[in-house]
Amino acid sequence: MIPESIAAILLAVPLGTLVIQSVSYWSEFTKSEGRARSTEKAAYSKPYFYALVFGVLCMWVAWLGGMTLLALNRFESIFGWRAFQSHSALWSQISGFVVFYLGAVTYNLTLFAAGKYLRPAPSGIREEHRLVQEGPYGVIRHPLYVSYVLILLGLSLALRLYWLLIPTACILLGIYPTARAEEEVLVERFGEEYTAYKRRVGMLFPKLL
């Protein structure tokens, strides 16, 4: 079994780089929001969109909560109780952290590739928006959504939190309708450029040929 302090560090490392990128992103976003006008907005199906949002919120609760509780276990002798108890087998922890890191790295690379063009879903598209096709976007069209699923699956295995399969199912339920709604706007905005991008790059899975 992986020591709990090591497990907490493994959860914290990608979070640190994510926080740095998020601060930079929101700083740029708030500056540009005042001088840029949004145009098209996706017509989301609310039940599917809210299912996806619920899944993402659960992801953050499990990620931050698991990391914090594992760290608090270091003070068991002081508190007299354990904050979190995980009995995952070593193979489950290792495979879980591999899947978790695949998702976390994809998440970080997506933020880096998209930069200021990554928009909160309801905000719409800026007039000066460009189609990002680098990094993870060169492999699949919606890498951020896929990263959510990988992170949740990884956490469920690494921390033995099998209830996370419920929010994972919610995200899987909401991904396709939400992505389709966004792509309708992107096709309208970018025309043939996005149509060609769709032919070349898979939506949620890489195109092998």
Which residues does each PLM region occupy?
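Active-site-proximal inter-transmembrane loops
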Residues: 121-145
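Membrane-anchoring alpha-helices and their flanking helix-loop junctions
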Residues: 1-130, 152-209
